Amino acid sequence: NGSHANLKVIGLSSGRQVQGIDTRVTNYGNNSVGHILQHGVILERGTLTFNGIGHIVKGAKGADAQQESRVLMLSDKARSDANPILLIDENEVTAGHAASIGQVDPEDMYYLMSRGLDQETAERLVIRGFLGAVITEIPVKEVRDEMISVTDTKLNKR
């Protein structure tokens, strides 16, 4: 009772890479909290699918299950799906989900480039900001630093 689970997920798909990321949080106890936050970026011909399941079992009164899945596509050849699933077996609960898939606003890119940034640097800033919204939520500094390092390494291979 009163337990908390907060999943933070980032995905970065490039080239012809295909990624499917499945997350699941099950609320068993009263007043338990299960939150899933997922952000992904797709470059080139990459494919990224987020499948998130929030499950509140019978008897878990006052439980809270929330999901947010957001994907940013940086190519018209990129493919993505965000599939939030809520399985609710109790009445007195709170549950919700949000999902969005979109491209970088051309006006944002124009603004950054009008300030002297080349397209690659502007894209990198947009990607870091988008994924940073999840990375900054990770409570363990070493894990945050590793996520930043892995992201930078992947972006530098482009």
Q: What are the language-model segments listed below?
A:
Residues 130-140:
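Short arginine-rich
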Residues 111-116, 121-132:
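Extended amphipathic alpha-helical segments enriched in small hydrophobics
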